Swiss-Prot record:
Native organism taxonomy: Eukaryota, Viridiplantae, Chlorophyta, Nephroselmidophyceae, Nephroselmidales
Name this polypeptide is given: Photosystem II reaction center protein H
Organism: Nephroselmis olivacea
Domain of life: Eukaryota
Cross-referenced InterPro entries: PSII_PsbH, PSII_PsbH_sf
GO BP term, example: photosynthesis
Keyword hit for Repeat: no
Assembly and interaction partners: PSII is composed of 1 copy each of membrane proteins PsbA, PsbB, PsbC, PsbD, PsbE, PsbF, PsbH, PsbI, PsbJ, PsbK, PsbL, PsbM, PsbT, PsbX, PsbY, PsbZ, Psb30/Ycf12, at least 3 peripheral proteins of the oxygen-evolving complex and a large number of cofactors. It forms dimeric complexes.
Length: 81
């Protein structure tokens, strides 16, 4: 029968290989599912997101030449000098 399973397939699924990397990373997974009470590090994440948004806006303004920088060339030709 094509839908039947063999004992060999079940044996392969039940035995798992323990690797040194898995053993080293196991302590990092011990806190899985636990949530710290309160806001935790959310304000810090918000601060870094705001700083990253400001960084992206500055890069966009430089690219669009909206932000004029004296003595800074924004063409490929000036980069080759």
């Amino acid at each position: 029968m094509a839908t039947g399973s063999t004992s060999k397939a079940k044996a392969d699924e039940s035995t798992s290989k323990i690797t040194p990397l898995g053993t080293a990373l196991k302590p990092l997974n011990s806190e899985y599912g636990k949530v710290a009470p309160g806001w935790g590090t959310t304000p810090v994440m918000g601060l870094f997101m705001a700083l990253f948004a400001v960084f992206l806006l500055i890069i966009l303004e430089i690219y669009n030449s909206s932000l004029i920088l004296d003595d800074v060339g924004v063409s490929w030709y000036s980069l080759g000098k």
